[in-house]
Amino acid sequence: AAQEPGSRPDELRHRRDRALILLGFWRGFRGDELIRVRVEHLRLVPGEGMTCFLPRSKGDRQAQGNTYKVPALSRLCPVTATWEWIDAAGLTEGPLFRGINRWGHVGEEALHPNSLIPLLRRLLTCAGLPDAEEYSSHSLRRGFAGWANANGWDVKALMEYVGWRDVHSAMRYIDGGDPFARQRIEASLPETPALPGPAAN
C-alpha cells in the first residue's frame, strides 16, 4: 500500500535530508566527505557544537585524518538537525547518511556517491532553486564559500575552516560566483548622495 503523507518514511527522509544539507553547507563538505561521516566519529560539545572526525580526506597525505568543528547555530542548525536524524533513525554507529526504503527501513550502508547527486538535485528542485541539474557534489562547499566570502571572511579564515591548504583551491570556489568581483564592489560602494534642493532666494 502507498504510504500516507506524514508517514514514517517521509519523516525519516525529511530528517536525513535536512541534516545532509545543513551539515554539508555549514561545514563546507564535499559530497564524498558527507557520505563518509560515521556516527561514532561525532562528538557533542555542549554550548558550542560538535566535532566530526574523518579518518581520511583528499588533502590528508599522511592519512592521519582530520577533525572538523561544526557550530551550533540559533537557526538552521547543523548540530540539531544531525542529532534529530540520529535519534529518529536509531543510529548508534556506522554511516551517518544511508538509504531509506519505501517502508521506512534505514539501510546499513552509506549512500552511494552516484545516488547523492540526484538526491541533492531533487532537494534543490523542491526548494525552488533554478537550474538544479547543474549542481554537483561540490555545490554545498561552493555555496558555503560564496556565503562566507560575501559575509566578510578573508581567504585565510575560509581556508582554515574548510581545510584547504592551497590558496588556488579556495579561489576556485570563491571566484566562481562573482568572477569580476562586481557584487563585492557594488556592495561596498557608498550610496549616491541626494542632490541638494534649490536654494531659497
PLM regions with names:
Residues 1-139, 147-201:
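Conserved catalytic core of the tyrosine transesterase superfamily
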